[in-house]
Amino acid sequence: MDRSSAVGGCGGGGGLGVGVVTSSATALGPGGLTNGGGGVVSGALNGLEAMSAESTGLCLQDLVSAGTANGAGSAGSAESATTTSTALSSGSTGSSTVNGGGSSTSGTEHLHSHHSLHDSSSSVSISPAISSLMPISSLSHLHHSAGQDLVGGYSQHPHHTVVPPHTPKHEPLEKLRIWAETGDFRDSHSSMTAVANSLDSTHLNNFQTSSTSSISNRSRDRKDGNRSVNETTIKTENISSSGHDEPMTTSGEEPKNDKKNKRQRRQRTHFTSQQLQELEHTFSRNRYPDMSTREEIAMWTNLTEARVRVWFKNRRAKWRKRERNAMNAAVAAADFKSGFGTQFMQPFADDSLYSSYPYNNWTKVPSPLGTKPFPWPVNPLGSMVAGNHHQNSVNCFNTGASGVAVSMNNASMLPGSMGSSLSNTSNVGAVGAPCPYTTPANPYMYRSAAEPCMSSSMSSSIATLRLKAKQHASAGFGSPYSAPSPVSRSNSAGLSACQYTGVGVTDVV
């Protein structure tokens, strides 16, 4: 006896009728399902009760797939699996066709016809009877092992195990629940693919598809809503900020334009000579004229009051600068006088350097004649050291009158202090002082100031000295630019040899 299961969707009531009928005939009506030909309905109802009692999940595929057939046919025992196409509709009366007679010897053949359920996003309507028998949680967690309860035979899917609906061991569903709670769905298709790969079976029921799709849609809507809210807030903030910024920029540009207009360089005012003369005259009298005075000056000079005010301001600045420079110059001059001028204006610290200089003590200085080389072997002082010893104590000057005259001539040509000292020494020499012009015989031997000038030691006469002087002058060693000696200006006929020697020394030097 062949048995097949048929599922019919009732259009009017929207319920789902389940029954086991024979292969002879099947009649589906709005009220449910009627069987003919001695079909058995109690098996299906008992299977539903047992399934609800065990609280196991019901898979929609088991309702559609065929059970085991144990009947004696003409050809022997055969198992015919008939499938019905599930029609889900809301308005039209649903009908289900039973395909019988399809026998197969392969045993348990599982034909799937519910793949269209995965593409649909609408939920399946369930009759109140099934919904009362089964909890909602069990409907969302269905397994293919329910066929054993319906038919009483062996399980068509031995690789599936009956798992309680909510067990923490089912990791893929736990991950799905976590993803659903967090709403982390970047792509619904990729998430569905990951879940399908993680599950043991690639066939998901309609309830799972609808729930995941609804959750993903809900999360997507939530994200879209948040995104739209953020965009609107950002847009409004940008608009508000830009609205605030625009008047700021316009208000900032306006003062800039005003400043540019104010800072435009005006043309310099060129004053005439008459205007400058009038302004200078007024400035000499009053450096700070008031408003009325400036207006009068402006009328006289044919200028504006502003130009007159600016001119006085600049003129006062120029006047202050000049006054400041003058004060600085005066202070600098005072500092110079106090710091350096007093040193130059003070008398010499040691007047005895020049006033009390011993001009009569010339014997301490070496003679320049002894150090100068001459091309001829002349030793004018060698004759003085010769062996002529005259004991005539003769002074350098013949008479006192001539000595006084010479001293007066020297004093007239020299400065006051030096002339006075020279005249004093000459007077002393006229009285009986030794001759100050005596040159030592040896340049490294000095005569003492107390030693008298002995003319007896000289071996040559005045004529011999004059002859040597002429020879020296004719040789070209005399300097034409040398100043004449004051002694030579005086009466040279009455000069002694000592004085003549001094004249020669002056010419050579």
Swiss-Prot record:
Motif Nuclear localization signal per record, residues: 464-470
Recorded name of the encoding gene: Ptx1
Subcellular location: Nucleus
UniProt function note: Appears to control physiological cell functions rather than pattern formation during embryogenesis.
Single biological process term from Gene Ontology: anatomical structure morphogenesis
Gene3D superfamilies named in the record: Homeodomain-like
Location of the region described as Disordered in the Swiss-Prot/TrEMBL record: 70-125, 148-171, 204-273
Biased composition regions of type Low complexity, renumbered to the chain: 70-98
Motif, OAR: chain positions: 460-473
Pfam short name (any one): OAR
Keywords noted in UniProt: Activator, Developmental protein, DNA-binding, Homeobox, Nucleus, Transcription, Transcription regulation
Biased composition (Polar residues): 227-242
DNA-binding region(s) in UniProt: 262-322
PROSITE patterns recorded: HOMEOBOX_1, HOMEOBOX_2, OAR
Family designation: Belongs to the paired homeobox family. Bicoid subfamily.
Listed Basic residues bias regions: 259-269
GO molecular function: DNA-binding transcription factor activity; DNA-binding transcription factor activity, RNA polymerase II-specific; RNA polymerase II cis-regulatory region sequence-specific DNA binding; sequence-specific DNA binding
This protein's GO CC annotations: nucleus; transcription regulator complex
Protein name (Swiss-Prot/TrEMBL): Pituitary homeobox homolog Ptx1
Stored SMART domains: HOX
Biased composition (Basic and acidic residues): 243-258
